[in-house]
Curated annotation (Swiss-Prot):
One of its GO terms (cellular component) is side of membrane. Residues 196-207, 317-328, 366-376, 624-635, 646-659, 780-808 have a biased composition (Acidic residues). Residues 66-83, 495-506 have a biased composition (Polar residues). Belongs to the HYR1/IFF family. It is a lipid-anchor; GPI-anchor. Residues 846-872 form a propeptide. It comes from Candida albicans (strain SC5314 / ATCC MYA-2876). Residues 43-65, 84-110, 125-171, 208-225, 242-260, 274-293, 349-363, 741-760 have a biased composition (Low complexity). Probable GPI-anchored cell wall protein involved in cell wall organization, hyphal growth, as well as in host-fungal interaction and virulence. A lipid is attached at A845 (GPI-anchor amidated alanine). Glycans are attached at N92, N290. Keywords: Cell wall, Glycoprotein, GPI-anchor, Lipoprotein, Membrane, Secreted, Signal, Virulence. The lineage of its organism: Eukaryota, Fungi, Dikarya, Ascomycota, Saccharomycotina. This is Probable GPI-anchored adhesin-like protein PGA25.
């Protein structure tokens, strides 16, 4: 074993402390010896009572170790031979207890400071132990060591011989050697590991240091460890644990081996289990282990700070015949550290929790039938939400939220149980809802619709208590409550544009078959209900027709209902013409609006109606040739007009004065007041005139009626007629510039052929154009026209728009901006459903209601655009 020794500032302290054990030398001699290492090694005198032993001859620190044979009766115990090493580290002296039959000799040499810093060949200590010595005379050795294992555990550089050789032969000498790592090696510590061989079957100990079991209970082991160097100076001040494994015999007196080192300072402050396991050899005797273990080395600092299980498992070889104990717990069970305070370890027991499963028993509410009732499907309920049965006779429905349906069907005590024996009742209640609904029965044969939210429809059909019970015994009643209204639907308008549908079921429809009708095809009657409703909106009579058609039923669980909405003025598809004076820029705008409501699904149980509204919108522009009046030959009027346009060529121009205001009605609001809709605003009142119809216009508009965002548009000959580009980049064709109409628009425009309802919100011109040229179809553009001075304003007698009469003829001619329809349903909280859908345009505050059928959910996607003919 190589011993490291380093001089330090504590040399004088060590010299004063160990003055009685060393020869007196000078301070500089000790310093020189500490720097260069001891070159002379003299064997220490053996104790007087010790027999003559053959000491182990050892070369200086820088020479290989040569050892002489050791007799089997005289094991050698190493003692320091260099006195200056004792000066450097007084605690590293080996104390040999005299024995009557044992002798120990220790040979040690030390290395210098440089060797210790950089590592080199240090001293070697060897020992030989005999297995024949009585355990009562085993000497105790107190030689600290930071790296060296005991005589029974060789270091990592010297593999041990087989354990059987160590047990049977008394003359076998183990020479554990370890190369010194130097100061840095001592600072970070080293760990040795070697495989061991046990006599037993426990082979899990191959990772731990070797442990040689003793062959006899009386065998004693003398553990000799060495240490020194700078790590030992501080560790001498703070005695700690050994970082090397310790081998002890459990039947012999306790052999305490303690090693100190710099890495063990924190270990001493926080005692814990050894990071390098000790190795103990236990016999089958019941001697408790009192092995003192300790750890060290830089890797062990954290483990010493937080005491826990050893990072390297300890190993012990037990000769028990019964079973192999856990080797990692046999050594550290009764271990006590050399310094610090021991922290006991308490076992932590875990508790397991058992879960108790609940068993729901079968309900006994279905046992009302006495003998032969089938009851195969009671209750065959397939709702999308929760079903909570109650004891009331009529179904009670409680809405639980959007998209959910709560159906509480119960079995009537008088209606379902009248058939005592043969009523199968296989479908009570066969409810397959497809939408969320709140169903509240209102009485025999009546239906109440209570909507539960936006877009939801609630139908509450009930079956009369007398209608189901007419068939006393043999009615299977497979359709209860498979109820689809087949009687007359009573449609009662409840307000402006709202329709309340309260369908009722005739009590004689289902009950004509008294006994044998299982009612598998009920209802098969599909009446067509048409209701015409006329109301006045802003003084304009409006007629709306609701048509309900029930197609043939192919399945008793699904039924389709078609709802068509018709506006007067041309039937289901209507056209309204708005006509202006034919002298200037005749233009016909034809708009077709088709509104259909197909695919109304009825679920028999939940009575859910889903209606899809399809809106088809088309418009066509027919520009006629502009007459030459006021266009050609107008060069002498206030300058030259375009003059280059002949028949078949016409243009649109801008007007800045805004004097051509219709006189047939009143205009109010911001902007220029022009019913055309100027950039700053639009007409904010009602404009009516002597045209072929009337128009209600009110509201706000962020642009012109045409969707442009700038000035009014004038025909040729008016002031402002030139080749200038529009100052706003907009166009009545729907320029993509700023100021396009935004918001919602609705209104009723009454033309020659009827009335129209325009609803919805608009963003952008409904013409959809994006150019700056105001050219009617068929023209190539007017940018290449000569720059002409336009005609003066409307007060010119020769102009086509020269007086109020001319402007007056165009009083009620307006095209409302295009709108995008998004159906919005507003439901009151009454029992009678008020299904109302409103759209508001930018040009009017008129609210038009979309009529809905029973359970009709109106969802529109498309454009509602005013239809008409515009003459400009």
């Amino acid at each position: 074993m190589k011993v490291t020794a380093v001089s330090s500032v504590l040399l004088t302290v060590a010299a004063l402390t160990n003055a009685n054990e060393i020869d007196k030398r000078s301070f500089f001699g000790d310093l020189f010896s500490g720097l260069t290492g001891s070159k002379a090694a003299a064997p220490a005198a053996a104790p007087a009572a010790q027999p003559a032993a053959q000491p182990t001859t050892q070369s200086p620190a820088d020479q290989p170790t040569v050892q002489s044979p050791v007799s089997s009766d005289q094991p050698s115990t190493a003692q320091p031979v260099a006195q200056n090493n004792l000066l450097l580290d007084s605690s590293n002296s080996t104390l040999v207890v005299p024995s009557s039959s044992k002798s120990s000799t220790t040979t040690r040499s030390t290395a210098g400071l440089l060797d210790n810093l950089l590592g080199g060949s240090g001293a070697t200590s060897s020992e030989a132990s005999s297995s024949e010595a009585p355990s009562s005379e085993a000497p105790s050795s107190e030689a600290p060591s930071s790296e060296a294992p005991s005589s029974e555990a060789p270091s990592s550089e010297a593999p041990s011989s087989s354990s059987s050789e160590a047990l049977s032969s008394s003359s076998t000498t183990k020479r554990p050697t370890a190369a010194a790592k130097g100061f840095f090696g001592d600072l970070f510590g080293t760990q040795s590991s070697a495989s061991e061989t046990d006599d037993e079957d426990c082979v899990e100990e191959t990772e731990s240091p070797t442990s040689a079991p003793a062959s006899a209970p009386t065998t004693s082991k003398v553990a000799t460890t060495t240490g020194g160097g700078l790590p030992n100076i501080l560790s001498d001040l703070f005695p700690g644990k050994s970082s090397a494994p310790i081998s002890s015999a459990e039947s012999s007196p306790t052999v305490a081996s303690s090693t100190t080192g710099f890495p063990n300072i924190l270990s001493d402050l926080f005692p814990g289990k050894s990071s390098v396991p000790s190795s103990s050899a236990e016999t089958s005797t019941t001697v408790a282990s009192n092995t003192t273990t300790s750890g060290g080395g830089f890797p062990n600092i954290l483990s010493d700070l937080f005491p826990g299980k050893s990072s390297v498992p300890s190993s012990s070889a037990e000769e028990d015949d019964e079973e192999c104990e856990d080797p990692t717990e046999s050594v550290t069970s009764n271990s006590s550290p050399t310094g610090g305070i021991s922290i006991p370890t308490f076992p932590i027991t875990s508790q397991s929790k058992t879960s108790v499963s609940s068993v729901v028993s079968k309900s006994t509410s279905e046992d009302d039938d006495d003998e032969t009732e089938c009851e195969t499907d009671i209750p065959t309920i397939i709702p999308s939400g929760s079903v909570l049965p109650t004891t009331s006779v009529l179904p009670t429905i409680i809405p639980t939220g959007s998209g959910s349906i709560t159906i509480l069907p119960t079995k009537s005590a008088t209606s379902d149980d009248d058939d005592d024996e043969t009523d199968c009742e296989t479908d009570i209640p066969t409810i397959v809802p497809t939408e969320s609904a709140t169903i509240i029965p209102t009485g025999s044969g009546s239906v109440t619709i209570i909507p539960t939210g936006s877009g939801s429809i609630t139908v509450l059909p009930t079956k009369s208590a007398t209608s189901d019970d007419d068939d006393d015994e043999t009615d299977c009643e497979t359709d209860i409550p498979t109820i689809i209204p087949t009687g007359t639907a009573t449609i009662k308008p409840t307000g402006s544009g709202s329709i309340t549908v309260l369908p009722t079921k005739s009590t004689t429809t289902d009950d004509d078959d008294d006994e044998t009708d299982c009612e598998t095809e009920i209802p098969t009657i599909h009446p067509t209900v048409s209701t015409t409703r006329t109301f006045t909106s802003d003084g304009v009579p409006t007629t709306q027709t609701l048509t309900t058609k029930l197609p043939p039923t192919t399945n008793q669980h699904t039924e389709t209902e078609v709802v068509s909405i018709t506006y007067t003025g041309g039937g289901q598809t209507f056209t309204t013409y708005l006509t202006q004076s034919g002298e200037i820029c005749d233009e016909t705008v034809t708009l077709t609006i088709t509104t259909t409501c197909p695919s109304t699904t009825v679920a028999p149980g939940g009575q859910i109606y889903t209606t899809t509204v399809t809106v088809i919108t088309t418009h066509t522009v027919y520009p006629d040739d502009w007459e030459d009046d006021g266009y050609e030959g107008e060069d002498n009027a206030g300058g030259s007009a375009s003059g280059s346009s002949d028949d078949g060529e016409w243009e649109w121009y801008e007007e800045d004065d805004g004097e051509c205001v219709p006189t047939g009605g009143s205009s109010s609001g911001s902007g220029t007041g022009s019913w055309w809709g100027s950039g700053a605003g639009s007409s904010g009142g009602t404009t009516s005139g002597s045209g072929s119809g009337s128009s209600s216009n009110s509201g706000a508009s962020s642009g012109g009626t045409w969707g442009g965002s700038g000035n009014d548009y004038v025909c040729p000959g008016e002031e402002g007629y030139d080749d200038e580009e529009p100052d706003n980049g907009g166009s009545w064709w729907g320029g993509s510039g700023s100021g396009s109409s935004s918001g919602s628009s609705s209104g009723v425009s009454s033309g020659d052929s009827g009335s129209s309802s325009v609803t919805g919100g608009s963003s952008g011109s409904w013409w959809g154009g994006s150019g700056n040229d105001y050219v009617c179809p068929g023209e190539d553009g007017y940018d290449d026209e000569d720059d002409q001075t336009p005609e003066p304003e409307c007060d010119d007698e020769d102009d086509s728009w020269d007086d109020d009469e001319e402007c007056d003829t165009q009083a009620a001619k307006e095209v409302v901006n295009s709108v995008t329809v998004a159906a919005e349903s507003v439901y009151p909280s009454t029992t009678a459903a008020s299904l109302t859908t409103s759209w508001i345009s930018t040009q009017t505050a008129q609210s038009v209601t979309q009529i809905e059928n029973i359970g009709g959910k109106v969802s529109a996607s498309g454009l509602f655009v005013v239809l008409g003919l515009l003459l400009i």
